[in-house]
Amino acid sequence: ELVKPLPDNSEYYVSIESLGSQPKEDYELLELHIEKSLDKNIIEDAVMAKTEKELQQIWKIREDVAILASKAKFDQHFDISIPISLIGKIINSIILELESISEVKTIFPFGHIADGNIHFIIGRDIDDPVIIDKINSIVYSPLKKHKGSLSAEHGIGLHKKEYLQTSRSKEEIKLMEQIKIM
């Protein structure tokens, strides 16, 4: 069963897991940082797991994100990496452009803030190659300008091959092709 630890009215959510050699002291230190962040309005709300069960409930949200994210008939999954300092700006610009496509029904970004790896699940109500290409172009277009990557974790594959030049030079692509032949 999915338990929501916080109200679902925020624009962004962040999960932090910390592991140290002194669990009690580490927990208190994280709690202090969260309190300071709340006091300075850096964050709006927070919840800390106090038991293993609560921790597993929070992780279940992340693990089931694909199921939760797409309420549309068709969806597209993306796995890009972008500079950490630009995560908010790039995600917001992608969302803004995607919202202009009437066939897009859900836009769900999530990922790993610490390494700039962002996933998008974008739901649409029709399976139209023109719309698919338009969505691909919107998601991949910031990568070249900001030195991002087309695939952070899951490889290029056939679906991303035509967009590889958005994050790799001709020389890099040629080298990748030569390595693949080996």
How would you describe each model-predicted region?
Residues 1-182:
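Noncatalytic alpha-helical scaffold of FAD-dependent oxidoreductases
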